[in-house]
Structure formats: C-alpha cells, structure tokens
Amino acid sequence: MVQYNFKRITVVPNGKEFVDIILSRTQRQTPTVVHKGYKINRLRQFYMRKVKYTQTNFHAKLSAIIDEFPRLEQIHPFYGDLLHVLYNKDHYKLALGQVNTARNLISKISKDYVKLLKYGDSLYRCKCLKVAALGRMCTVLKRITPSLAYLEQIRQHMARLPSIDPNTRTVLICGYPNVGKSSFMNKVTRADVDVQPYAFTTKSLFVGHTDYKYLRYQVIDTPGILDRPFEDRNIIEMCSITALAHLRAAVLFFLDISGSCGYTIAQQAALFHSIKSLFMNKPLVIVCNKTDLMPMENISEEDRKLIEEMKSEAMKTAMGASEEQVLLKMSTLTDEGVMSVKNAACERLLDQRVEAKMKSKKINDHLNRFHVAIPKPRDSIERLPCIPQVVLEAKAKEAAAMEKRKTEKDLEEENGGAGVYSASLKKNYILQHDEWKEDIMPEILDGHNVADFIDPDILQRLAELEREEGIREAGVEEADMEMDIEKLSDEQLKQLSEIRKKKAILIKNHRLKKTVAQNRSTVPRKFDKDKKYTTKRMGRELSAMGLDPSSAMDRARSKSRGRKRDRSEDAGNDAMDVDDEQQSNKKQRVRSKSRAMSISRSQSRPPAHEVVPGEGFKDSTQKLSAIKISNKSHKKRDKNARRGEADRVIPTLRPKHLFSGKRGKGKTDRR
C-alpha cells in the first residue's frame, strides 16, 4: 500500500544558497593546489575534475528535487486533485519543468567546457575555462530562483497536510458551515479541531481516528460547503468537493434542524440535492444535529417534508440500507445519539466493503480453499459417545470433592459489596500464633530497618551465642592464670603486680588522651619546660617496668632532628690526635658538605636507600623498589603540569597545524 508522507521532501534552497552549497562542496572535495610547472595533461585533468564534480553535484541536487515532489498523474486521484486545487497544477508542473530544464542545461554546459579543456595549452587558459563553466552553471541556477522559492513554499504547505490514506476505512463529514461537524469529530476521535460559533472555522481537511469492532477508521472533517455554482466555489469548499468525489467512504451529511447555523432547512436540503451525485454508491447517513435546541417533534410540516424527501433520495443512493440507518438524530452538546451515529456509519461502511469484496474475482480463489464437512446420518438411531461408567463416577466424585475456593471478590459480594467489606491482607500470614497476624509492626525503629532483624530462631541463636561467649571468656581467663606463680619469689610477685598496675594506668590514660595524642604537634625542646619528652625520662620509666630501654633510646635519637651546621662541619673535630686522622676527617667533612649541598639533608638523616626500623621494609632493595614505583606514579601528573591528582583543568588548546600560515589578507592561506 502506498504511503503518502510529504514531510520527507527535502528542503529546497533558494538560488544563492544553492550556489553556495555546490561551490563550497567543490572547494572542499576536490584538490586545491596546482602549479604552472606541472605537465599540461595534469593541469587539464585538475580543472576538468572541478567542472565535472560541480556538474555532478548540481545534477544530484536538482534530481532529488524533481524525484521527491509527487507527480500528479502517478499518485492517487484524491491527492492529484487536492494538490491541483491548492497549488494550481499548471504552475506546479511549470516550476518542476524549469528545474528539469536547468539540470539539462548544466549538463550540456559541463560537456561543452570539458571538451574545450581538453585543448587548453596553459594553466591560465584552463583556469579561465573552469571559471567560465562554473559561472555559467551558477547563472542558469540563479535564473530559476523564483521557481525554487515557489517549490519551497509548496513543500512547507504539503508538510502540514494531514496524512490521509485514500484506501482505508473512512468516515467523511460534510454539510453547511457551523452545523456541528467539528464538534462531532472531537467527540468520536482524539482530534482537537477548533470549534467557534461562526462560519468557516475549519478551512482545511482534518483527520482523526476511531475504533469500531477492533478496526481502525479514519474520520475526515471537511470545511463547510455553500449552495452555489461549481465555478463560484473557493479553495476551501473545493477541498470538501475533492474528498467527496474521490474517497470511498461513509458520508455523514449534517443537518442543523435548529437553524442556529444561519441557514434554513430548505437551504440545507437544496445543498443536499445539488451534491447528491457525489454520494452515489456510498453509505449515506443524514444526521439531524442540535436536537437539544429543536427536537424533531417541534419542526414544521414543510421542514419535515423536506427531510423526508432527503431520506428518500438517500435510500436511492445508499446500498441496502433501512430507514432507521439513513436518518439519525443526535446532539453533540448532550452526547445524545453520538455513538449510535458513529456505529451506524462504521457498520454500513464495513458491510459495503465486505459485499464489494465478495463480488470481486479474487474472492473465488479464496472460497475454493474452504470446505466444511458435515456428516449425514445414515439412520434415525442416536449414537452417543461410549464412556465407561467407572470414569463417569470418578469424575462425579472429583467434582463433588473439589470445592471452589472463595476469592476476595466472592467474600466482598457476600458481605455487602464494595465500600462495606474491607479485605484483610494479613489473614494469610503464616505465623506461630494467629493472634500475631493483626499486630502493628513498624518499618523503622530507633533508626534501624525492622525487617533486617526479623528471624524466627532469633532467641535460640542468641542463647547459643551467649553460651559460646561464656566458653571463650572462661578459656581466656584460664590461659592467663596458667603462669607458674609458684616459681616466682615474693620480690618478683611484688614487681609483677606493680607492672600490671602501671600497665593498666597507661592503658587508661592512653584511651583518655587518644584523640589529643593523635593531633599533638611536635614540641621543640625549648618549649618542653617540664622535661616530659626526654630520652632519660623514657629510659627511667621503661627500666622501672623491667624493660630494656637501649633499643628505644637509640631509635628516638635516630629520629630526632639535630643541628645541621654542627653535624656537617664539626662532626670530625673531636679526638684528632694524629695527622693521618686529621686528613681523613678533612675528607669526610668535604664529602659531608657536598652531600649536604646535593640532597639538602642533615647528617643525622639516614640515606634514602637505608632501611630505618619501623618503615616496614625488609631490606634496602625492597625500599628502592617502592621508591621507584612511587616516582613512576607521579610521572603522568608531573608531565601534564598538574597541581595534584584532582587537577582537571584543560588549558586553551591552539594546535599548530590549525593556526600556522594564516593571515588576515589571505595572502598565505595555504599550509
């Protein structure tokens, strides 16, 4: 099935934009550097390529315009006549013809100048021929600028046309202006057509969709039609006439019996008789609208006779319709009869389409494939299926034993219906006691999710955990008391008790001052007036505990900061008794000076590769490996001159290949 989607037509540029597009593409897609020292064949090929490429681009763009715009003779007659009404078929064809002529002229110009370029004997002549060829092509295109502008306006208007499928199931609404056509369409479809209390609110075709018996129907709202000669009708009315003439649809002729539209029933009947030829072989329904303002019983006898004449004419044009299906009444204000009108029109249209298909030749090919076999009785004896009695009894027992489980819907109907019966969502909970089902359990308690702590065996698990903790604590106490206290003397026992007391006091003080100790800064000696942080005091306290303070004191001295100048210059001045010792000490001082100048560290600081106790390295090899890995991780950051790992600044990038060889006058615009 052909899909008419005019929104896919490519935008048509005007003459100046067209030239800019083509020449810019030629400049970008073809070589731009040529020298007079090249061979003449190379020069000819260079400029011939530009002319051919430009002609190819012109041909492709113009061909796309010609091919994408619909040809009125090849599309559905409805769209052909609609486009003729809207845009004038002669002007439309003339514009496309001028585009086609321009395409042929450009091809001819390219062919002529390529032939001339074959005989070019210098770079200057070849270039002049190229300029002349491209100039003539652009001149031809600029001459059709009005046609291109006209086609662009047509393209924009066609993109706004509704997507009407001429071959699908269609319901067409027609009648005088302001009789309620758009209001009915808004009721039966999801379309949002503007409705106003004045005539000719609808100025073009509008499409909506509705469903009937699981089938999709398109509903077309047409502009109002006036009763006047065909030659006097305007474009708005001709859109309605075109739709009535070419679409195989169910027609709803709206009749305003109240006269509020500004036209009497006699005028509306005259319009019906003037266009009744367009209703031939189509399901026709006469809809008497606005019955809320004027009921059918209150109209005059003359108007009633006119309506009866219209109904009799509709019976002649319609195919196999009854009187009830031809004349219907409704009110879009109160929604009375709206759905009955829609259903009657859809049913009439469906019956007509089925009947038309049954009369076609293709249906015979399908009907021959169907065969319904009906067995004929050979006698009057009734032969029932033979089922054993045991099977019947078993099925009866199963049916009796199988009780239907009552659902919440059944319980609701038994207990008073909706609003009276309240279903309990907790009655099927599986708990240890039934009285627990209706307990109110919070979701959050003391900042914790209650569901995380729900466990049926929580009490049993708690008892097991307490028993294990008791066994473990008892084992620890026994292990602590395993010391052979009997082997210790009285003096040793006294020292042991003092050590334990001091240890407990230290632990307690450490816990109290933990946060303070972590944030404490290094205290210089001159501010340590109470002599709290000295190695002598540390040695006395460790000796009082019974520990050897020598290793701790050596480590403290190695970590302490000394005087740099004394360590570097005067370290070798003590105990110099012999000249040889003086010479060796002098060399050591020189080495110490150079090392201090190179790495800027004091003599008390150990070398970088030397392992200091407490650093966590096994030997100097492992420490050097760790230092290398650390330095390697900093390379990427240092290479990009980052301030740190969080530095994500991207500086202004000015790549050289994009900024070199560019001057304002364009003298050196080549790289």
Swiss-Prot record:
GTP binds at residues 175-182, 221-225, 289-292. Its main location: nucleus. Residues 631-640, 654-671 have a biased composition (Basic residues). CDD domains: NOG. One of its GO terms (biological process) is ribosome biogenesis. Signal peptide: none annotated. Residues 169-350 form the OBG-type G domain. Residues 516-671 are annotated as: Disordered. Keywords: GTP-binding, Nucleotide-binding, Nucleus, Ribosome biogenesis. Transmembrane segments: none annotated. It is found in: Nucleus, Nucleolus. Pfam families: NOG1, NOG1_N, NOGCT. One of its GO terms (cellular component) is nucleolus. Residues 595-605 have a biased composition (Polar residues). One of its GO terms (molecular function) is GTP binding. Belongs to the TRAFAC class OBG-HflX-like GTPase superfamily. OBG GTPase family. NOG subfamily. PANTHER family: NUCLEOLAR GTP-BINDING PROTEIN 1. Involved in the biogenesis of the 60S ribosomal subunit. This is Nucleolar GTP-binding protein 1.
